[in-house]
C-alpha cells in the first residue's frame, strides 16, 4: 500500500484560483434569480431598522474610483447591519437635472433651437435614463446589493412633486423670496451658481490702484485730496457708487510730493511701497477715523457720478488701502452695505458677461476684455496710480472650469439667515465619526449667505411661481400644491407644455389680473435643491424607509453640497437634521498621491479593475484604505491587494479541505473536552470576532483588513494550521485529537466567512457554497457571529507560550540561514530558564511540545538560563 493512501489528505472542490472576473457574474446572477435583496429584508422585517440614505450620483459619465469607493463602503455598512439582524433597506438614487446633461446633448449634435423646450427636456430625460442604466449595471458588478429595480430618480413625477411640496412649505414660512442681489454668475454656463457649485483655482488678474478726487469734503478733508482704492477687477469700476471705510480705523491724509492721498494709517507703508513713494517725501497732514469720513463725497474717475464715502464693518487691513471700492451690483459685502445707504445697484452685464448699453463706452465688451479698456481710460484721466498683475485664488464654475463673477440679477432665494441658528443647533445634535467633520459643516453653515435657488436653464424642476398682470408674485399654498399635484400626475414637463392659466387651479383669480391673464416663472431650481429634497422625496415617501436616516455617507466635498442642502431644507420644514450620523470619505488619488488625469496616464477605473482582477479585489482594496482622508490606488497597490486576497483564499481553502469529513452535528467535541491548544484558538477566534464586530460598528475597515491578515498569518498559517497538519493527515479519522481540531477549524471557517462576507461578498458566498452542513442558503442570509466572553486566564497562558515560540522560531530561522538545518523538523531545541521567568516550570503545563514548536525534539532544562540550541 502506498503510504500516501493512508493519509487523510484535504479534499475540496473549492478552487485554488479565484477566477473572479468570470465567476463573480455567475454568483450575481444567482443572487438576482433568488431575489436575495428581498429575502434579506424579509428575514429581518420585524426587527429594528437601519437606514443608510444614498446620496445620488450624477447621471452622466462612466464610474470612476471615487464612485466605487463610495458605493462599496455603503455596501459594507448595509450588509453588515443586515447580518446583525437589522432591517436595512438600501435604495440607490440618481441626480438627473442640470447643465452637464444639456451640454452632453449639445456635444451629441442636438440643436435645441430646432425644438421646443418640452421636446429638448424629453431628450434630456432619455439621456439621463440611459446613463442610469449604464451606471446601475456597473454598481451591481461591484457586488453592491440594493433595490436597483426600484431606485429613486430626481426626474420622476413623484419625486418632483415631493420637491415642490417641500418648496411650498418653505414658502409658507416666509423662507422663499425674490430679490435682486449679486450672486455667483457663470458667463460660461449663463446661469447663477450656488456656493456649492464654486471651486477655486489660480487666476492671473490685473491689480490696480485708483485715485478718486474729493468732490465735497464736508469740511473734513482737504478739497484737493484723493482717496486711493485697490482692486483686482477693473471691469467693476464703471459700477462703482461708493468708497467704504471702517468706522473705527484710523485714516491719514498724506502729502506725497504735493499730492494729497487718503489711506488707512495701518496700510500706509504697504501703499507707499506698492506705489514707489519716497519715504522721505511722505508727510502725514491730517488724521481721522473712518466714522469722521462718512458722507464725504468723491468723484467717479470717468463718470459723472458721486462716489459716496460710507462705513462698513467688512473693511480690513489685510490688503489694499483701507478704502474699499464699492459696487453693490458686483459684490455681496458691497450690496449689504449699499442697502444701508440706499445706494443704486448697477450691473451693466448681460447673461454672457458682456457689457450692455448701460456700460457706456464698454458696451459689447466681454467683462474680462474690458479690464484693459477700463485701465486705459483711468490712465487717460490721470486716475491710475499703478497697474500690476497678480496670481490669486479665484472662484470658478465647477462644471465649465471657467471664472465666475458676482452679478446682481433678479433671483429666487431660500433664506438661510432665518433658520441658520436652528441648522447649527441641529448639527450639534448630529453624531460624527471625526470632530473635523462637524467643524467643517458647522463653519460652512455659520458663514453661509442666502441660498440662490434659481437657475436660468431649462433642464430642471420649474419654480412653481406665477405673475399677475401687474407683476405681483403668486406663490400661495393653493397654487403650489396644485402644481405639485399636476407634476405628480403628468411630470414637470407639463409646465413647459401648458399656459400659465392651465397650470393654475380651476377658476383661480387674482386682483392683480383683472383680465384673468397670468405668466409663469421661467427659471428652474438649483440641482442642490433637487437632491437636498431627497429626505422628503425618498425617506418620507418610501414605505420601507423612514425620516431621519441613520446615516448619510458621501465624499468630503458634500459638506458644502448634499449634506448642506439636505440639512437646510430638513430643518426649514421638519425642524431637525435628516441624518443622525454623518460620515465622509476622501478622494481617490494615484499611487503617488496625485490627482488622476488622462494626460498623466495614471487613471484607473472600476471597470478595468473588475475585468482584470475582479470586484472582490476592488472591495478588498477599499477595506485597506484610510478612507477618511484621500486614498491611493495604482497597479502596484492592486497587485499587493491581490497577494493578500490569495493568502486569504488559500487559508479558507485549506480549512475547507480539512473539514470535508466533519459533520458538526455528530462529530463536534464539547468545548470543555477540547484539547487546550484548540480551546486557545477558539478563544483567539472570539477575540478576533469581537474586535472585527467593533470595527464594523465604528466603520473602521482598515483595522479589519489588518487584523484579518494578522489572524490568518500569525495565528493560523504560522501556527495552528502548520501545527495541525500531522493531526489532520495522520491521526485516525475519528480520533479525539483530530475531531477536537476539526471542531475549532469548522468554527473558524464559519465565523471568518461571515466576518469577511460584507467585504469579500463573492468569495464568501463561494466558500459558503463549499462548506458542508451549513443551514442558510447564502452566507449573506446568515447572522454575524455573536460576541462572547473569552477565557482570559487561558489566553494569558498561551500568549506567554506564543512569545516563547517566537523566540524559538527566530533561533530556527538563524540556524537555517547558517545552514545548520534545512527544515525545522531536523532540529532539537533546548530551552532553559531566564533570570525572571521559570521557563521549564511553565512548559511543564504543555503536551506535545515538539509538535507545537514543529521540531523533532524539545528538551527543557531546569536551573539554567534561557537558551535555545539547535542540535
Curated annotation (Swiss-Prot):
InterPro entries linked: aa-tRNA-synth_I_CS, aa-tRNA-synth_Ia, Anticodon_Ile_BEm, Ile-tRNA-ligase, Ile-tRNA-ligase_type1, Ile-tRNA_ligase, M/V/L/I-tRNA-synth_anticd-bd, Rossmann-like_a/b/a_fold
Motif annotated as 'HIGH' region, chain positions: 57-67
Catalytic activity: tRNA(Ile) + L-isoleucine + ATP = L-isoleucyl-tRNA(Ile) + AMP + diphosphate
GO terms of molecular function: aminoacyl-tRNA deacylase activity; ATP binding; isoleucine-tRNA ligase activity; tRNA binding
GO cellular component, one term: cytosol
Motif ('KMSKS' region): 595-599
Cell compartments where the protein resides: Cytoplasm
Gene Ontology BP annotations: isoleucyl-tRNA aminoacylation
Top-rank lineage group of the source organism: Bacteria
Residue numbers binding ATP: 598
EC code: 6.1.1.5
List of residues binding L-isoleucyl-5'-AMP: 554
Coiled coil (UniProt feature): none
UniProt cross-references to Pfam families, sorted A to Z: Anticodon_1, tRNA-synt_1
Keywords per UniProt: Aminoacyl-tRNA synthetase, ATP-binding, Cytoplasm, Ligase, Nucleotide-binding, Protein biosynthesis
Residue ranges of the TM segments: none
Primary localization: cytoplasm
The protein's assembly and partners: Monomer.
Family from the record: Belongs to the class-I aminoacyl-tRNA synthetase family. IleS type 1 subfamily.
Domain writeup: IleRS has two distinct active sites: one for aminoacylation and one for editing. The misactivated valine is translocated from the active site to the editing site, which sterically excludes the correctly activated isoleucine. The single editing site contains two valyl binding pockets, one specific for each substrate (Val-AMP or Val-tRNA(Ile)).
Function (record text): Catalyzes the attachment of isoleucine to tRNA(Ile). As IleRS can inadvertently accommodate and process structurally similar amino acids such as valine, to avoid such errors it has two additional distinct tRNA(Ile)-dependent editing activities. One activity is designated as 'pretransfer' editing and involves the hydrolysis of activated Val-AMP. The other activity is designated 'posttransfer' editing and involves deacylation of mischarged Val-tRNA(Ile).
Official protein name in the record: Isoleucine--tRNA ligase
Encoding gene (name): ileS
Amino acid at each position: 500500500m502506498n503510504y500516501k493512501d493512508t493519509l487523510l489528505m484535504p479534499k475540496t472542490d473549492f478552487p485554488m484560483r479565484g477566477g473572479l472576473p468570470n465567476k463573480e457574474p455567475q454568483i450575481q446572477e444567482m443572487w438576482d434569480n433568488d431575489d436575495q435583496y428581498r429575502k434579506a429584508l424579509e428575514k429581518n422585517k420585524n426587527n429594528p431598522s437601519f437606514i443608510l440614505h444614498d446620496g445620488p450620483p450624477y447621471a452622466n459619465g462612466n464610474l470612476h474610483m471615487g464612485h466605487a469607493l463610495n458605493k462599496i463602503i455603503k455596501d459594507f455598512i448595509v450588509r453588515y447591519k443586515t447580518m446583525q439582524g437589522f432591517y436595512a433597506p438600501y435604495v440607490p438614487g440618481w441626480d438627473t437635472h442640470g447643465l452637464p446633461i444639456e451640454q452632453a446633448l449639445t456635444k451629441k449634435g442636438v440643436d435645441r433651437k430646432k425644438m421646443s423646450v418640452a421636446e429638448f427636456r424629453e431628450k434630456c430625460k432619455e439621456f439621463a435614463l440611459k446613463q442610469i442604466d449604464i451606471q446601475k449595471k456597473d454598481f451591481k458588478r461591484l457586488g453592491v446589493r440594493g433595490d436597483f429595480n426600484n431606485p429613486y430618480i430626481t426626474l420622476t413625477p413623484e419625486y418632483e412633486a415631493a420637491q415642490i411640496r417641500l418648496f411650498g412649505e418653505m414658502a409658507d414660512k416666509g423662507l422663499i423670496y425674490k430679490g435682486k442681489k449679486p450672486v455667483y454668475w457663470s458667463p460660461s454656463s449663463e446661469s447663477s451658481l450656488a456656493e456649492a457649485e464654486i471651486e477655486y483655482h489660480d487666476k492671473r488678474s490685473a491689480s490696480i490702484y485708483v485715485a478718486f478726487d474729493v468732490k465735497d469734503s464736508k469740511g473734513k478733508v482737504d478739497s484737493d485730496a484723493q482717496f486711493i482704492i485697490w482692486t483686482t477687477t477693473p471691469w467693476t469700476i464703471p459700477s462703482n457708487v461708493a468708497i467704504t471705510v471702517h468706522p473705527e480705523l484710523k485714516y491719514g491724509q498724506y502729502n506725497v510730493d504735493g499730492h494729497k492721498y487718503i489711506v488707512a494709517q495701518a496700510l500706509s507703508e504697504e501703499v507707499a511701497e506698492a506705489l514707489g513713494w519716497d519715504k522721505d517725501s511722505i508727510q502725514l497732514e491730517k488724521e481721522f477715523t473712518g466714522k469722521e469720513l462718512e458722507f464725504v463725497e468723491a468723484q467717479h474717475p470717468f463718470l459723472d457720478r458721486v462716489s459716496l464715502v460710507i462705513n462698513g464693518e467688512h473693511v480690513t487691513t489685510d490688503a489694499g488701502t483701507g478704502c474699499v471700492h464699492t459696487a453693490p451690483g458686483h459684490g455681496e459685502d458691497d450690496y449689504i452695505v449699499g442697502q444701508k445707504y440706499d445706494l443704486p445697484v448697477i450691473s451693466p452685464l448681460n447673461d454672457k458677461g458682456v457689457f450692455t448699453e448701460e456700460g457706456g463706452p464698454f458696451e459689447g465688451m466681454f467683462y474680462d476684455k474690458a479690464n484693459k479698456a477700463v485701465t486705459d481710460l483711468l490712465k487717460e484721466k490721470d486716475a491710475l496710480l499703478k497697474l500690476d498683475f497678480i496670481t490669486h485664488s479665484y472662484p470658478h464654475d465647477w462644471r465649465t472650469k471657467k471664472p465666475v463673477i458676482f452679478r446682481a440679477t433678479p433671483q429666487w432665494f431660500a433664506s438661510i439667515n432665518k433658520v441658520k441658528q436652528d441648522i447649527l443647533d441641529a448639527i450639534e445634535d448630529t453624531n460624527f465619526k471625526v470632530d473635523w467633520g462637524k467643524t467643517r459643516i458647522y463653519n460652512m453653515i455659520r458663514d453661509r449667505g442666502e441660498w440662490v435657488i434659481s437657475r436660468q436653464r431649462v433642464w430642471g424642476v420649474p419654480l412653481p411661481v406665477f405673475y399677475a398682470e401687474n407683476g405681483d408674485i403668486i406663490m400661495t399654498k393653493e397654487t403650489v400644491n396644485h402644481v405639485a399635484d399636476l407634476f405628480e400626475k403628468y411630470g414637470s414637463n407639463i409646465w413647459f407644455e401648458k399656459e400659465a392659466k392651465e397650470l393654475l387651479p380651476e377658476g383661480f383669480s387674482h386682483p392683480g389680473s383683472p383680465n384673468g391673464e397670468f405668466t409663469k416663472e421661467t427659471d428652474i431650481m438649483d440641482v442642490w435643491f433637487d437632491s437636498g429634497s431627497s429626505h422628503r422625496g425618498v425617506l418620507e415617501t418610501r414605505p420601507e424607509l423612514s425620516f431621519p436616516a441613520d446615516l448619510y455617507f458621501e465624499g468630503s466635498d458634500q459638506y458644502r453640497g448634499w449634506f448642506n442642502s439636505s440639512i437646510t431644507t430638513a430643518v426649514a420644514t421638519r425642524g431637525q437634521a435628516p441624518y443622525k450620523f454623518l460620515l465622509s470619505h476622501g478622494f481617490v488619488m494615484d499611487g503617488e498621491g496625485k490627482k488622476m488625469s488622462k494626460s498623466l496616464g495614471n487613471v484607473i477605473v472600476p471597470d478595468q479593475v473588475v475585468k482584470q482582477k475582479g470586484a472582490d479585489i476592488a472591495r478588498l482594496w477599499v477595506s485597506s484604505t484610510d478612507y477618511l482622508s484621500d486614498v491611493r490606488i495604482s497597479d502596484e497597490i492592486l497587485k499587493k491587494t491581490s497577494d493578500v486576497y490569495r493568502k486569504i483564499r488559500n487559508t479558507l481553502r485549506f480549512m475547507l479541505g480539512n473539514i470535508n469529513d466533519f459533520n458538526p452535528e455528530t462529530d463536534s467535541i464539547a468545548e470543555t473536552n477540547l484539547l487546550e491548544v484548540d480551546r486557545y484558538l477558539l478563544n483567539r477566534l472570539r477575540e478576533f470576532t469581537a474586535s472585527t464586530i467593533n470595527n464594523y460598528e465604528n466603520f473602521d475597515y482598515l483595522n479589519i483588513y489588518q487584523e484579518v491578515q494578522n489572524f490568518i498569518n500569525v495565528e493560523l498559517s504560522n501556527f495552528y494550521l502548520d501545527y495541525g497538519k500531522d493531526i489532520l493527515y495522520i491521526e485516525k479519522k475519528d480520533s479525539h485529537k483530530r475531531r477536537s481540531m476539526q471542531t475549532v477549524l469548522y468554527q473558524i471557517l464559519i465565523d471568518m466567512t461571515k466576518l469577511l462576507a460584507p467585504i469579500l461578498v463573492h468569495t464568501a458566498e463561494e466558500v459558503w457554497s463549499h462548506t458542508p452542513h451549513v443551514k442558510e442558503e447564502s452566507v449573506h442570509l446568515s447572522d454575524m457571529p455573536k460576541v462572547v466572553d473569552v477565557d482570559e486566564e487561558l489566553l494569558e497562558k498561551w500568549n506567554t507560550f506564543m512569545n516563547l515560540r517566537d523566540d524559538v522560531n527566530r533561533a530556527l530561522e538563524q540556524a537555517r540561514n547558517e545552514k545548520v538545518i534545512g527544515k525545522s523538523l531536523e532540529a532539537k531545541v533546548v530551552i532553559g530558564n531566564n533570570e525572571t521567568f521559570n521557563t521549564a516550570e511553565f512548559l511543564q503545563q504543555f503536551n506535545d511540545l515538539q509538535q507545537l514548536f514543529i521540531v523533532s525534539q524539545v528538551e527543557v532544562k531546569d536551573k539554567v538560563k534561557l537558551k535555545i540550541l539547535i542540535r
